[in-house]
């Protein structure tokens, strides 16, 4: 059953077990939903700016007129209309802004599925869960603390889970976790006024695990020495963990905050791109290279 937008809009969480083409079709529907709300948010934002500007210009023009009393009634009506228009536009913009999703998340998943489809059976299902709610949602806050003068709220957002199986029988599981910090501090300016400043920090942590088919590959314990040698991660990412746990190969990497989910660029090693799909592709390639080396040695 395809995605139900009415249900999706309640939580902004998409969860389904289906074939890759079916999941991809759902993601395109979600993308259309997001594009509509982005357009509406922009439209009502322009309405806010227009009503504010017209009201301000009218007030200044009438206030500097020598015939202020003559235009008082008209001015009050006009300014009241602009005020009401501003409030309506603000409410509408806020409503659509709440449904303005993080494009890069579903774009990353869509691009990764496109890459995985090449080595998956056409009828092989994948299990997907993607959370498109904002990373600083109250339900994702784990603790509060202090860093120097900053009051910090810490959030953990496990927004992506994807699992499936390749044609060779290897099972995979991909997880995406956003670590988000909301920082705020209060200070006094030179004039003695109390002011506040806020900023945020975030990083994406991606974890990939592979469970090889024991009939085709050597025991996982034999792969430990090969994993670090086979790593080919983008230069802008950081390896956090690589190793073997029981019967699985594990690799965890971190990305900068400004990563995107668009297709892999012509020059993926350019630090200005920070392509999430490129990082995931290189993680798969690194682990599979270790598997293939193990298979060749076994043969």
List each language-model region with its residue ranges.
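Residue-level signal for secondary-structure boundary elements
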Residues: 35, 121-125, 295-296
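Terminal low-complexity, intrinsically disordered regions
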Residues: 2-12, 288-299
């Amino acid at each position: 059953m395809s995605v139900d937008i009415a249900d999706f809009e309640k939580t902004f969480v998409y969860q389904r077990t289906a074939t890759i083409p079916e999941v991809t079709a759902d993601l395109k529907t979600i993308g259309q939903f997001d594009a509509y709300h982005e357009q509406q948010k922009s439209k009502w934002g322009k309405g806010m700016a227009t009503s504010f500007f017209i009201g301000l210009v009218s007030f200044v023009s009438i206030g500097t007129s020598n015939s202020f009393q003559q235009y008082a009634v008209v001015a009050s009506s006009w300014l009241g209309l602009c005020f009401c228009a501003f409030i309506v536009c603000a409410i509408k913009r806020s409503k659509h802004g709440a449904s303005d999703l993080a494009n890069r998340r579903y774009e990353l998943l869509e691009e990764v599925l496109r890459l995985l489809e090449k080595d998956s059976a056409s009828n092989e299902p994948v299990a997907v869960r993607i959370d498109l709610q904002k990373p600083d949602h109250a339900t994702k806050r784990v603790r509060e603390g202090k860093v120097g003068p900053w009051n910090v709220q810490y959030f953990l957002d496990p927004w992506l889970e994807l699992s499936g199986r390749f044609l060779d029988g290897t099972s995979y599981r991909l997880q995406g976790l956003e670590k988000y910090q909301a920082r705020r501090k209060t200070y006094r300016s030179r004039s003695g006024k109390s002011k506040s400043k806020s900023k945020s920090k975030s990083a994406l942590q991606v974890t990939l695990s592979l469970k090889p088919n024991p009939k085709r590959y050597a025991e996982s314990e034999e792969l430990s020495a090969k994993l670090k040698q086979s790593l080919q991660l983008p230069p802008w990412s950081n390896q956090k963990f690589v190793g073997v746990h029981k019967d699985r190969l594990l690799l965890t990497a971190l990305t900068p905050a400004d990563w995107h989910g668009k297709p892999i660029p012509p020059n993926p090693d350019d630090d200005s791109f920070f392509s999430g799909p490129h990082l995931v592709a290189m993680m798969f390639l690194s682990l599979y290279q270790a598997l293939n080396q193990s298979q060749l040695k076994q043969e």
